Swiss-Prot record:
It comes from Anaplasma phagocytophilum (strain HZ). CDD domains: bS6. GO terms for cellular component: cytosolic small ribosomal subunit. Binds together with bS18 to 16S ribosomal RNA. Pfam families: Ribosomal_S6. This is Small ribosomal subunit protein bS6. The gene is rpsF. The lineage of its organism: Bacteria, Pseudomonadati, Pseudomonadota, Alphaproteobacteria, Rickettsiales.
Length: 109
């Protein structure tokens, strides 16, 4: 199964509890489709350059997923219907990077 890098931005009005619920719901959806969440990162509440759907900030999250292409297509379709997700980007990658991403800071911090 190929790996995917799935970044999404959630609405600024979500509480930390609601954001955790959203992430757990997306993870449960992946598992239901036979996919696997390999890695999850929360990058924080960051400012937008321009407003998106009347939001000036958003919760940035990154998921690394191992899934079949058909399952990933269905996952993207369902995420598109979720009103709490403002934007998302899904890319196929060769492997999941080890350690923390640049957005999280280096491992030496």
């Amino acid at each position: 199964m190929p790996f995917y890098e799935f970044a999404f931005i959630a609405q600024q009005g979500l509480t930390q509890y609601e954001l955790e619920g959203l992430s757990k719901g997306l993870t449960a959806l992946l598992v239901k489709m036979g996919a696997e969440l390999v890695k999850y990162e929360y990058w924080g509440l960051l400012d937008f350059v321009y407003s998106i759907a009347k939001n000036n900030k958003g919760h940035y999250c990154m998921m690394y997923i191992r899934a079949e292409p058909a399952a990933m297509d269905e996952f993207k379709r369902k995420v598109k219907l979720n009103e709490d997700v403002l934007r998302f980007l899904c890319l196929k990658v060769d492997k999941v990077p080890e350690g923390r991403s640049a957005m999280m800071g280096s491992d030496q911090d």
